[in-house]
């Protein structure tokens, strides 16, 4: 059975790594490269600060891609607010997640096990499989087939804040990326922690050949200033493909469907032009989106006639056209 240790990145005295730790790290790098090589396109979703709807955007883009027929995964790397599973209607903490791991592994073994073999050989086969998957963490699949991996699955209570030191956080993020067993995917969407600290940086460093870094902002100036810092960090890492989505840009009245641009119009576009990054459109404030974390699922796939769902389909089409063709 795959083991999921939570002892992330403990170094020897004085920050020096023992040969054993160096070996483990190299093996992790190899697993990471192998895992990511099976994924065609990677989209990292970022924001300068929390509260701009970054996770909602990431979850909806993943759902939209999956609904369009692409094999898609979403990695919720936001350690402090891992709320993607909740948005997708997955209620699973550490205990249930460990059971899920066991069930998936059992299924894998049973699929390939030749029961006509002598018992001894069957046992050997199972041991081999255990070895093969000892580091694998299997993402949870939603009804639509979207694969989901989140920090939320590795904690025993959602009420308990995750209090870790820096190296433990980056170690945990790295483990999620290297050990999640995605299989072949067309798209992996990564919901990055907000800001420009070690955690978002770890994600960018761990994922080579990111096809797109998607910045989520809102019309207020502070949100834009924070995004500017993020854009500079991404550019320093030599990632050229950066797109911007302006979330909560206008209001749709739930009663008459009238569109109200309460913050003025065209802010996001002007901001993206100024930073010389690609503007991918705006999204409204809408009652159903604001409620979505408590609802059972994100909105886009639930209601294909919905204005917001249509916007996500347009945004995904633009992403494909601008960055992937």
Sequence positions of predicted segments:
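Extreme N-terminal, non-catalytic leader segments
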Residues: 1-49, 93
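Walker A/P-loop phosphate-binding motif and the immediately C-terminal alpha-helix
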Residues: 42-80
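Phosphate-binding loop that captures ATP/GTP phosphates
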Residues: 72, 77-155, 170
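Glycine-rich phosphate-binding loops of nucleotide-dependent enzymes
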Residues: 149, 173, 192, 205, ...
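Cytosolic-facing regulatory segments adjacent to core modules
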Residues: 150, 155-197
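Conserved catalytic-core segment of NTP-binding enzymes
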Residues: 179-182, 186-291
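C-terminal boundary of histidine-terminating zinc-finger modules
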Residues: 295-306
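Short, hydrophobic alpha-helical segments
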Residues: 316-325
């Amino acid at each position: 059975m795959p083991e999921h240790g939570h002892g992330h990145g403990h170094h020897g005295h004085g920050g020096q790594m023992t040969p054993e730790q160096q070996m483990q790290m190299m093996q992790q790098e190899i697993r990471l490269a192998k895992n990511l090589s099976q994924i065609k396109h990677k989209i990292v979703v970022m924001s300068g600060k929390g509260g701009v709807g970054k996770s909602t955007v990431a979850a909806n883009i993943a759902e939209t891609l999956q609904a369009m027929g692409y094999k898609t995964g979403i990695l919720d790397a936001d350690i402090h607010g891992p709320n993607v599973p909740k948005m997708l209607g997955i209620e699973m903490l550490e205990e249930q997640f460990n059971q899920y791991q066991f069930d998936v592994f059992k299924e894998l073994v049973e699929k390939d096990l030749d029961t006509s073999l002598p018992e001894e050989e069957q046992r050997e086969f199972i041991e081999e499989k255990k070895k093969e998957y000892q580091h694998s963490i299997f993402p949870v699949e939603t009804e639509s087939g979207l694969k989901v991996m989140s920090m939320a699955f590795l904690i025993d209570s959602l009420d308990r804040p995750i209090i870790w030191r820096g190296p433990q956080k980056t170690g945990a993020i790295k483990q999620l990326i290297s050990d999640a067993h995605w299989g072949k995917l067309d798209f992996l969407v990564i919901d990055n922690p907000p800001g420009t600290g070690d955690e978002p940086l770890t994600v960018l460093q761990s994922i080579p050949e990111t096809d797109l870094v998607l910045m989520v902002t809102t019309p207020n100036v502070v949100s834009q200033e924070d995004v500017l810092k993020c854009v500079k960090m991404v550019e320093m890492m030599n990632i050229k493909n950066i797109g911007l989505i302006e979330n909560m840009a206008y209001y749709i009245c739930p009663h008459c469907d009238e569109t109200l641009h309460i913050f003025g119009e065209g802010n996001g576009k002007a901001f993206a032009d100024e930073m010389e990054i690609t503007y991918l459109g705006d999204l409204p404030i809408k009652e159903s989106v604001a409620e979505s974390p408590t609802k059972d699922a994100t909105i886009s796939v639930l209601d294909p006639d919905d204005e917001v769902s249509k916007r996500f389909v347009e945004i995904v089409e633009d992403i494909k056209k601008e960055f992937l063709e």
